[in-house]
Amino acid sequence: MHYKHILAAIDLSPRSQEVIDRAAEVAASNNATLDVVHVIEHSPVAYGGEFSIPINVNLEQTIESEARKALTELCHTVKVPSERQHTLSGVVKHMVIELAEKLNIDLIVVGTHGHHGLDKLLGSRANAILHVATCDVLAVWMKE
């Protein structure tokens, strides 16, 4: 299959470079456009457990700013321009799929490092994306 528009979904872990590099290889071999997305997923556990405590606006802005900076550094290595770099907030699978549909993506590249069941094979977020994606999904194994 020939891909025209690829989306790499990364978590900004140290192994995210492997995902971006693989996505860039596939994009280059298909002469495809490459976009990269990172989704900031706010966990209720991190902010007070079961109780809904509003996140500090300054903290949220700092997290987003640091995420954008890290994303820019990772994307620089494979020359992804800033207009093709996306930092979003929300539930990872929903935000990745929403962006993929908006951009008419035909391949989503995700990293995987899960630890049990299908999650071991794919990783929980990669598995979630695979089950709702309307395009091909390439799971890149990230070494522990």
Swiss-Prot record:
Cellular component aspect of the GO annotation: cytoplasm
Annotated Gene3D superfamilies: HUPs
This protein's record includes keyword Membrane: no
One GO term of the biological process aspect: response to stress
Alphabetical UniProt keywords: Cytoplasm
Localization terms from the record: Cytoplasm
Keyword Cytoplasm (UniProt): yes
InterPro entries: Rossmann-like_a/b/a_fold, Universal_stress_UspA, UspA
Lineage top rank: taxon: Bacteria
Family affiliation: Belongs to the universal stress protein A family.
Quaternary context: Homodimer.
Function as written in the Swiss-Prot or TrEMBL entry: Involved in stress response.
PANTHER family: STRESS RESPONSE PROTEIN NHAX, UNIVERSAL STRESS PROTEIN A-RELATED
Name of the molecule in the record: Universal stress protein A homolog 1
Organism in which the protein naturally occurs: Coxiella burnetii (strain RSA 493 / Nine Mile phase I)
Gene that this sequence comes from: uspA1
